[in-house]
Amino acid sequence: VEQAVHTVDWLAWAMKDQMPVSCTAVGGRQIPANGGNIFDHIEVNYLWENGARGFMAQRQINGCFGETALRILGTKGIAEITGRGSSITGENAWKFKPAKDKKYDMYDLEHEDLFLSIRDNKALNDGDRMMKSTMMAIMGRMAGYTGQQVTWEQALNSKENLMPEITSWDSPVTV
């Protein structure tokens, strides 16, 4: 779930925090390592109730092309957020132009929001959004590792336990 979890956040935000109804996925382990058993690449295809689809693809393999980007293809254009900037092409074309006197660092901005909430005594609670986003990532992992379509309800009601059974401090731990 750690792989590209924030890309899953972006998909949820693009869908106005509505969670997908199901997903399918493919993935695997290309590069054997000294231990470990998690996928080093996965692609998840999320489906929303309105028929919209969102795709998340990632890999953790040295020497490969790397990009973190969000592209939303709509009927009137394409929105794109990459390390090179943000823009919309099509009917409502737009390009982000940073103001020289403003901060845009995401870490600075999240800290400013936190400090403002403390000073104003207003709770800042993203718990529900974070829980749903994490569950969305878990649902994608479940689909990838099982090769099955997984619904939101199946993921929520799953009894899957990935923790090794550790009965003592001397118990062997599978890597």
Question: Where do the protein language model's features map onto the residues?
Answer:
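Contiguous beta-strand/loop segments that form the cofactor/metal-binding neighborhood of enzyme cores
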Residues: 1-175
